[in-house]
């Protein structure tokens, strides 16, 4: 029975594959305030309050995505600027107060649907910002984008149920305890086989698609009617570009699909984990 399932690992992987926007950073000496970037200075109209913690400490720009520069991906905006800020003054671990983080106190996600590109209307004096010693990167990086297909991590909280719903053998009812145990072991064997083939292909910086994990999927513990199942941003540790989340970790931002459709970024799930 296992050999039959083992031969369908690739078929299963192809059935659940999703497109994402792959992000490739590059070193640059100069960026505009409104272009896509990791780190650096943000686009902010002068009449906008700079994002702060409740104690009044300025947050630092982690990433800025200008959707006029990205390929089109279903559910993501086709225009506007989306920003991710985190507390980087050393008071928290990359802006995380609790795991996972929903309160936008030590991080912030801000969306500008109609950017004003008149430089005279934009904040250009950031001398008030303290050094970003708690950022996972030290330099401002420009970003290139491309569409890429991504596989789901076996650590994804939805993965086990997807395996069961995909194969008819797991959908029988009125099973004995021994049969249920045997089928669960079969799922375990299938997951192990999948991980051997696909887990090393996961990771990287991206928008959309599936997240990668270095530990558990924190979303499994949330008690909400709707899951945080859309990956807004993933930023990986990246030696080439001096990005490091602790010990080879990864930072992820998730949103509920219904909130994304409304372009409501007030409730975003932020997670960070390292090896």
What do the PLM-derived regions correspond to, one by one?
Residues 1-275:
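Preference for intrinsically disordered or flexible, low-complexity segments
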């Amino acid at each position: 029975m296992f050999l039959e399932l083992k031969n369908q690992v690739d078929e299963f992987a192809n059935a659940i594959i999703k497109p994402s926007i792959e992000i490739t950073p590059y070193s640059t000496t100069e960026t505009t305030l409104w272009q896509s970037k990791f780190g650096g200075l943000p686009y902010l109209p002068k009449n906008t309050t700079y994002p702060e913690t409740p104690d009044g400490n300025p947050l630092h720009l982690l990433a800025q995505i200008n959707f006029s520069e990205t390929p089109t991906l279903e559910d993501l905006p086709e225009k506007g600027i989306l920003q991710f800020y985190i507390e980087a003054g050393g008071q928290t671990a990359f802006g995380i107060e609790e795991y996972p983080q929903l309160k936008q106190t030590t991080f912030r996600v801000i969306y500008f649907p109609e950017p004003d590109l008149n430089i005279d209307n934009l904040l250009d004096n950031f001398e008030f910002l303290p050094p970003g010693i708690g950022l996972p990167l030290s330099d401002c990086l420009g970003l290139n984008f491309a569409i890429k297909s991504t596989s789901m991590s076996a650590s994804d909280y939805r993965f086990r149920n997807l395996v069961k719903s995909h194969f008819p053998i797991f959908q029988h009812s009125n099973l004995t305890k021994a049969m249920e145990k045997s089928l669960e072991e079969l799922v375990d064997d299938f997951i192990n086989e999948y991980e051997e083939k696909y887990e090393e292909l996961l990771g990287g910086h991206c928008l959309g698609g599936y997240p990668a994990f270095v530990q558990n999927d924190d979303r499994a513990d949330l008690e909400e009617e709707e899951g945080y199942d859309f990956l807004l941003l993933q930023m990986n540790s990246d030696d080439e570009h001096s990005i490091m989340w602790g010990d080879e970790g990864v930072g992820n931002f998730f949103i509920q699909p219904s909130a994304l459709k409304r372009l409501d970024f007030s409730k975003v799930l932020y997670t960070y984990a390292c090896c």
